[in-house]
């Protein structure tokens, strides 16, 4: 049973992380009558603007997190980012708190080491060669295992922060320094990954729900500086590669446990499929599903975590998303060009309403459908290009 917000019988969900993905989750929760409490480290975050109420705390502070949960008494805690005191969630789950999908999944996926060791060592799934390092000396030694080129990432980061490619021995110091500056929890451990000469990479949105495991059509995407710039659905791939991708995703998701949507990232080389990463929550490349499916990844996540059946997922045909990425400094951001952007055929816009920008930040996304992936992608790019951002 779901209660009514602001009443004694309300069903309360607490979002830990209130960015653009959390905002869409909040909206879908509210569609089904759930009372939403949005939490983040800064005020006026996107999901806070549509939640019933909000709080600003350091979510890496276990005591602060525990105190807030004790005060609000949520029925569901929904992590939307990695930078959370996950050990606190593990302890609270043992006391009866419902963490989505599970506290274990949140802990394992908060850093790249936990999930990579699960996939490669526990589940024996194919991955790139990798080494974890705690020092520059260890990084230099790791290159003998991974070879050059290789990718260096902090074990805990997102949106490409701290991620770089070593293409020659002269890049090693710079890669180490960048990884140390880009981690979510500050300086620390890194992963060095051997370079897979893949044909393309996909996100396979995988839903674990009361009526079983479900897959969305594969999503292709383009990354730049470790961050997604465009995505499209469906990504064409062989039936054998798709079967292998679904097998890997199913293995990982079932091991992590719980109900919810998981963004499983995979590299594809011919018919070979390699596991890369997984997020136990909606994925940024999956924003294309806001226009490409009858149920977006956010709607699917909410259905699953509320214990509701997913049923059949209808994919509407070639669709694409293009990010509105801006660089600057402002705490008073404005937008123009919306009319021109929406004059593009079969388009939609999402402006995230982020309260400020310091450096480079994703402020919105253009969505489009077309008769082909190329047409949808070009339309989405044209629509995104119409948006002008003003720092007032």
From Swiss-Prot:
Keyword Signal: no
Presence of keyword Transmembrane: no
Keywords: ATP-binding, Ligase, Magnesium, Metal-binding, Nucleotide-binding, Purine biosynthesis
Protein name, per record: Formate-dependent phosphoribosylglycinamide formyltransferase
InterPro entries cross-referenced by the UniProt entry: ATP-grasp, ATP-grasp_carboxylate-amine, ATP_grasp_subdomain_1, PreATP-grasp_dom_sf, PurT, PurT/PurK_preATP-grasp, PurT_C, Rudment_hybrid_motif
Binding site for ATP: 112, 153, 158-163, 193-196, 201
Boundaries of every ATP-grasp domain copy: 117-306
The family this protein is said to belong to: Belongs to the PurK/PurT family.
Single GO BP term: 'de novo' IMP biosynthetic process
